[in-house]
Amino acid sequence: MTPFLRQQLSRQALRLAEIDAALADPKVCSQIGTLRSLNREHARVSALVDRWQRYEQREQDLAGAQELLDEPEMAELARAEIGAAQADLDRLDSELLTALMPRDADDDRNAFVEIRAGTGGEESALFAADLARMYLRHAERRGWKTELMSESVSDLGGYKDVVLHIIGDAVFEALKYESGGHRVQRVPATEAQGRIHTSACTVAVLAEADEAEEVSLNPAELRIDTYRASGAGGQHINKTDSAVRVTHLPTGLVAECQDDRSQHRNKARALAVLAARLRDRVRQEQAAKDAAARKSLIGSGDRSDRIRTYNFPQGRLTDHRINLTLYKLGAVLEGDLDEVIGALQAAHAAEQLAELETQA
């Protein structure tokens, strides 16, 4: 481990003491947003400090065992301890490097996942429904909660567009790399000749704004329209103007919700989606600036980036950003995204590490 990284890890103990002092301050405890943020940081930093202390202890154990190699009666025991200590150090070294990487401030947030059908007509809408189901199944595997915020259903039961609200531990951290263009290659249900078609959808993953969020929605800049809900929901929902569409006039961003019978709840949900879209707009602008300075391997999350292909005839999934190919398409579409997400996170961590080491 480099002296620079050791210095960074040693500083974490000082930061932990600062957080403990802040959490003991009654003024800080009265500020819910600050308290929540500090508690999250405390959990992360305390785990990092604990690993660093174990690393230092195992270094001492290794040095002690190496000194015993010259004593014949202790040599065999020393060699066993050296092997165990080195294995622990290698594992802790990897864990510490990962934990030391700069974290996205939005990683701990819930997320909205917006899926829009693109090229391919009805087949694209059916693929959008497949993607929505994939994310819902993955959320179920992780123990996350989900809500359907809005949907526009196609003639064959696909989605022209759909917005999912996914709630749980570090949802955005796991799903943020899903933003971009998703392409499918398969024989559509509507294809009589058995020919393979290519269709596409776009996915946008937006971090949810906190209740006491920095995004302020000026009522004077909002146009709120109500209309009669369409689609599933029964007779009652179609007899009232319960659906709500909110337009942010300065940017033209729109959010709508029609899936609750209560106009008030639909409005609250639409405003939550709009706040997330405004935050994402700022995030995308910053990402564009960063991209001008350096080219990220996994991309910026730009919706125009084609990130992944799902090839049904071959049972193949290919993530083009990291040249990852898996022949387990069925499992992935059933929500088994862990290997894909893990590979993307590892690629991002490797980029960050390379950047961090240049600062040493």
Curated annotation (Swiss-Prot):
Protein source organism: Leptothrix cholodnii (strain ATCC 51168 / LMG 8142 / SP-6) (Leptothrix discophora (strain SP-6))
Entry GO CC: cytoplasm
Record PTM N5-methylglutamine, positions in chain: Q235
Residue ranges the record marks as coiled coil: none
Name of the molecule in the record: Peptide chain release factor 1
Subcellular localization(s) per the UniProt record: Cytoplasm
PROSITE patterns, alphabetized: RF_PROK_I (PS00745)
Function: Peptide chain release factor 1 directs the termination of translation in response to the peptide chain termination codons UAG and UAA.
GO function terms (MF aspect): translation release factor activity, codon specific
UniProt PTM: Methylated by PrmC. Methylation increases the termination efficiency of RF1.
Pfam families the UniProt entry points to: PCRF, RF-1
HAMAP family in the cross-refs: Rel_fac_1
Family matches, as InterPro entries: PCRF, Pep_chain_release_fac_I, Pep_chain_release_fac_I_sf, Prokaryotic/Mito_RF, RF-1
Family: Belongs to the prokaryotic/mitochondrial release factor family.
Residue intervals passing through the bilayer: none
The entry's keywords: Cytoplasm, Methylation, Protein biosynthesis
